[in-house]
Amino acid sequence: MPSMPFYHRPGRALRPLTARASAPAARRVETPVAVSAAEVGYAVIDLETTGLSPARDRIIEIGLVLLAPDGSTQSSWTTLVDPGASVDVGPTFIHGLVADDLIGAPGLADIADLLVRDLAGRAVVAHNARFDVGFLTQALGSLGHLSRGARIPRVCTMELARTYIVTPSRRLVTCCEAAGVPIGSHHCALDDAHASAGLLRRYMSVGRERGDGPVAWSRSLESAAAFTAWTWDEAAART
């Protein structure tokens, strides 16, 4: 388990970082080699942010769940993120966080190598992936961890909802209710990431029952295996 200072929401028990599946080796490589199909998987992510604009706003909480290609959970972690002393935390009525909650939390630059290592070789899954991937692209690109113009392979559980479940709305809570997927505290990053992972597994199950051919998530694994735009320091990811 890394010694990195992960910070969690007040009143929530610390979840230890469990052993991760191996990621493609890298020591600050500028062009990582493509990984084999056997090494890929999914990185289900949820971000809580100070607002809606990747260019202007900041990430203040990350929840990440790593899945094998069959959808089984491999590991998960979460942390609060300090956006900087002069940054307003934004809509507390949505994410439930105030400035004092983020005191002492790592900045994104402090955990970026770990985050990128865990994303590498995986298709990024999110509910409203355009939002979360937009923030990842802006934030990690500005830190030099993602090549300019690169399009992160992604799967959007919100876009796929009406193909695989019957739901009156594509909101995460509504989709989970329709799919029978448990959800913890909505807008708590790790709980929402686990909920999105549950939706993906439900879609996989429905797809198998219907005899669907290659679908969005399986094609995304091929894209993830060939994606070479990440850069990270393996030593920094372990400290």
Question: For the regions a protein language model found, what residue spans apply to each?
Answer:
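Low-complexity, compositionally biased segments
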Residues: V116, F135, H194-A195, A236
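Acidic two-metal-ion nuclease catalytic site recognized across multiple nuclease folds
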Residues: P2-A34, G198-T239
